Each structure stands twice: as C-alpha cells, then as structure tokens.
Regions:
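Zn2+-dependent cytidine deaminase-like catalytic core
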Residues: 1-87
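Phosphate-binding glycine-rich loops and adjacent basic patches that engage nucleotide phosphates
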Residues: 5-9, 30-37, 51-58, 93-103, ...
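Short, well-ordered, mixed-charge alpha-helical segments that flank or form enzyme active sites
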Residues: 35-37, 62-66, 88-92, 114-119, ...
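Hydrophobic, well-ordered secondary-structure segments
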Residues: 70, 85, 89-93, 132-139
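Short low-complexity, flexible loop/linker segments enriched in glycine and/or proline
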Residues: 69-71, 94-98, 161-162, 263
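Proteins enriched for Cys/Gly/acidic motifs involved in redox and nucleic-acid/cofactor modification
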Residues: 81, 85-111, 117
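Enzymes that bind and transform nitrogen-containing heteroaromatic metabolites
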Residues: 76-78, 105-293
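Residues that form generic nucleotide/phosphate-binding pockets
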Residues: 17, 91-98, 138, 211, ...
C-alpha cells in the first residue's frame, strides 16, 4: 500500500522487498507514476524488477503522469493494460478533485434530532456513542479539522481521534477566529505540541497575535469570510500548506455558509429518532440544510 504521507507509492513499497519479481504480473489501482518527486518514478522500479505485465485501474489525473506510463513501459517491452471501472474512479474521488481544482476535498458533519434541531437544551449530545465513534473515525481519515472559535469556546473539545488503535492519528487543526476571541486554557492546548494548530483571523493586532503565537498557535491572516471568493482563497492557502482533505466541525451558522456557497463535497448527517419539540434549538435557520435533502 501507499505510505501514510503519500510517499513512497504502493508499487515502490511492494517491489522494494528482497524477492525475485522477474516475469511477474503487477496489479495497481492507479496508473504508475512517471515523474520525479520526493521519490523516483514507479515505472523505473517496475523496469528494474523485470515485471512482465502491468494492470492498473485508473489513469492518474496528475498532468505529470497522465496516460504516460503505458507508452513508457511499452517501450521497455512491458505489457500494460488499463482495467477501466467506475469503482476505481470512486475510490479516488478526493484525489481527482484535488488535481482538478487545486483545492482540498471538503466534508462536514451535522447531528440532528428527528424534527431537525441541532441543539438539545437538556443534553449536551444530540446523537449516541456510536455516532461519536463514527465522527472520530472521520477525523482520522482527513488531513485536518476545521472549526470556529465560537464552537470551540462552547464545546471545549479536543477535536482529535480517540478510537483505540487510531489514537496516533491527530489531524492538524484550523480554527476560524476572525476577531481573535478564542478562550484561554482550552483542552485543545494540550495537543498543540503534538499537532499543528492554526488560527485563521483578520485581526492584525500585534499584541493579540503574539499572545497566541507564544501558546503555539500558527497565525494565518485573511481579509474576511463574507463572499465565496474569500472562502476559496482560504482553502487555497490550506491546500498550499499540503492539506488535501479537510473536515469541518462547526455550528449550523457556519455550515449554512458552506452550503450556501456550494463549497461542500460531502456532508455527513447524523440523525436520531427523537422529537425534541420545545427542548430543541437551532443557532441558525435550516433552509440551506433542507435545500440539499
């Protein structure tokens, strides 16, 4: 398999073993790369190990490699076949989006009651422990988590993965805090040395930014988040920092903004079977959530 940080690729990891692969068939989901990056091209080690046939499921959308492997390997007398299937394309949904738009794949979650309230006045949680475990699993599958200072100040959440066996997966954290109102001594400060934590703000006050920098936060300055283009510029900045998949955990107000501007690739809705009526509350209207149902 491909290494966790994306390098080396699966082909190189497999063929680097001390095994005689001469005359073997190689099966891989993605077209073997032909370009130099952090590691040499996978086609080089395929040739070196004297592979006879290469079968792959999907043309790499990366322009540096796209549809180049077949010609390269054919020139080296290695048979190559693209086994086309929608399953492979579905598997690489995030990657395709990254390469097409140079933006991170954006997902979010929301928990709702049966009558579409996102807040229970009498209980902290809307859904059950199983839903929470799924949410933690989703965190582990993304490069970073994005929340807002408003949500964090209310919930005081660690925003990490706390599933046994996945504890080491601590996605970096981005906090949207336009006016630098994040509280002091939050639980998440325990993890600042173990993961990168960014504050996205429009506040240029030197004393305030210095205060947060001393605590270990990294500051990202933006103009605002009023228009769709503001959001896209923020996502471009996050993408340039190396984050390819982001997971939003925010309140309904911010989630509405993402939906309104059509910026979400995936929305996970956790809904229980309870009717809250007077015990239910929303910190924003539901019209954009209802629109995509």
């Amino acid at each position: 398999v491909t290494s966790l940080n994306g390098r080396p690729h699966a082909e190189r990891n497999a063929l680097n073993k001390k095994i005689n692969y001469t005359g073997s068939d190689l099966y891989t989901t993605l077209e073997p790369c032909t370009h130099y990056g952090d590691t040499p091209p996978c086609v080089n080690i395929i040739v070196k190990k004297k592979i006879k046939n290469v079968y792959y499921g999907f043309d790499d959308p990366d322009k540096r490699t796209h549809q180049k492997a077949k010609a390269f390997l054919k020139n080296k007398k290695i048979n190559t076949k693209n086994i086309k299937s929608s399953n492979f394309r579905n598997f690489y949904t995030n990657y395709i989006y990254n390469k097409k738009y140079n933006l991170p794949y954006i997902s979010a979650k929301i928990a709702l009651s049966k009558d579409l309230f996102s807040i229970n006045k009498k209980k902290k949680w809307i859904t059950n422990n199983q839903s929470k475990k799924v949410a933690h699993l989703l965190r582990s599958k993304n490069d970073c988590i994005i929340s807002t200072s408003k949500s964090i100040n209310i919930d005081n959440s660690l925003l990490n993965c706390r599933i046994k066996g996945l504890n080491n997966f601590k996605p970096d954290l981005f906090i949207i805090d336009l006016n630098l109102k994040l509280k002091k001594n939050l639980l998440l400060e325990k993890l600042i040395k173990k993961r990168k934590t960014f504050l996205i703000t429009k506040n240029k006050n030197a004393n305030k930014t210095l205060f947060y920098k001393k605590k270990g936060y990294k500051i990202i300055l933006i103009e605002n988040l009023e228009k769709k283009n503001n959001f896209i510029n923020m996502f471009k900045t996050i993408y340039k920092l190396g984050y390819r998949s982001v997971f939003f955990e925010t309140g309904l107000t911010f989630l509405n903004s993402l939906i309104y501007h059509k910026l979400l690739n995936m929305l996970y809705v956790f809904q229980n079977n309870k009717v809250l009526k007077k015990n239910g509350l929303n910190n924003s209207h539901m019209k954009f959530i209802n629109k995509i149902k």
